[in-house]
């Protein structure tokens, strides 16, 4: 089942009057449990473990092609994770593909600790595409990334168990009528902000 429909991260839709289209917004539970990031250990997370964790807790699940996965743990539970992959943009070396905390937890200085550790692994010249539907851009600014530009909202097709970008739908030559008749709902995200770290 798609994590967007789990109790931790519930999908909500709202009508935007100016565009008359359905926008996908993800609701996150408030971060009520505070954990000091300095009391946790930084680990390099195995790709399979990282994928399982992200599939459970991140609205879009695990990305493909991770080169480096770092997490903060107490030895039992991973509370915070950052994953990096080769950048799609040739101007940048690495893309920060996921930056996420365990639902309802606020890991104090968690992202700072992980980004400092990533630099020790030689990660530099980073780009991040921040999905405004569910990510907080101030988290990226807090680790020293700088805003570069915005990307317009993107159309997605969703069911309770799956999601597909409109570009993938067109590439597979699936018509809008086919998607609607098979239970897919067209929604738009809230756009993206591009952040960079040199």
Report the location of each language-model feature.
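Short, well-ordered beta-strand micro-motif
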Residues: 71-73, 83, 194-198
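BZIP DNA-binding basic region
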Residues: 1-22
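Short amphipathic alpha-helix that is part of the acyltransferase structural core
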Residues: 23-64
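Short hydrophobic/aromatic beta-strand or adjacent loop that forms the aromatic wall/cage
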Residues: 67, 190-194
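Acyl-donor binding region in acyl/amide transferases
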Residues: 41-44, 73-76, 80, 84-185
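A short acidic, often aromatic-flanked loop/helix-cap motif at beta-alpha or helix-coil junctions
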Residues: 11, 47-51, 155-156
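A short helix-loop-beta-strand connector motif used in the catalytic cores of GNAT acetyltransferases and
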Residues: 61-70, 75
